[in-house]
């Protein structure tokens, strides 16, 4: 049995509808969401689509970082899965079963269309967590997005273990301005993620870019290609199983989203 695991605390049904409906059109196995006090409508809809959830104390504003602890705890106590996908939810939809892609390695990461050195936000996330020396070492690498990670059960468990531990070790150090104005910095787990994936800590790993991979990571993508069915395809003409950050091209996906919703 495979598992799709996502932290979706703070979201309502309207924010998760596309994720859930598109997923259940292509995948029938276990899905688990990490939530915090879901409302009645969301609970009912998740039940209708056979989506399981854990009602936890996860804080929505901190869920980018704290989700790995919840992932680890659940996986460590449920050693029944073969493959696991960790995924974002609000800005994700599915075109095919993500476990059907012929991955050759046990842990797989997905690249954005630019380098760390060209992204001020990724530079900040790395420099203010792991520090300048790590940034200098990996800034020439392509940005690896932490919103999608797929692999074998044990390798995903090990990944979550390393993420939760290093998020504590390399806690984000805000600027004086952010500290004084109490600004919440989201997403800095990606700084830890890039440090880990480029530090030879994980074994038997692979990286996939938007050109040939099964996951479309769109925030930095310049243009989109669709097949005659209106589905997003990569440079090889293959449909992506997962489309992430589609809200960056929301007008291009209106007809596809309409089909999913109805």
Please state what every model-predicted region is.
Residues 14, 41-43, 92-96, 101-103, ...:
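Short catalytic/ligand-binding loop motif for oxyanion handling, primarily in non-cytosolic enzymes
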Residues 70-121, 157:
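GT-A fold catalytic core of metal-dependent nucleotide-sugar glycosyltransferases
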Residues 1, 129-131, 250-262:
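Membrane-proximal basic amphipathic "stem/tether" segments
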Residues 138-253:
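Catalytic core and acceptor-binding pocket of nucleotide-sugar-dependent glycosyltransferases
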Residues 61-66, 117-123, 252-253:
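Short, charged, surface-exposed secondary-structure boundary motifs
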Residues 32-34, 83-88, 93-94, 108-110, ...:
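A structural signal for short, well-ordered beta-strand segments and their strand-loop junctions
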Residues 1-82, 154:
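N-terminal anchoring/stem segment of glycosyltransferases
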Residues 124-140:
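Short, flexible, basic/aromatic active-site loop/helix in glycosyltransferases
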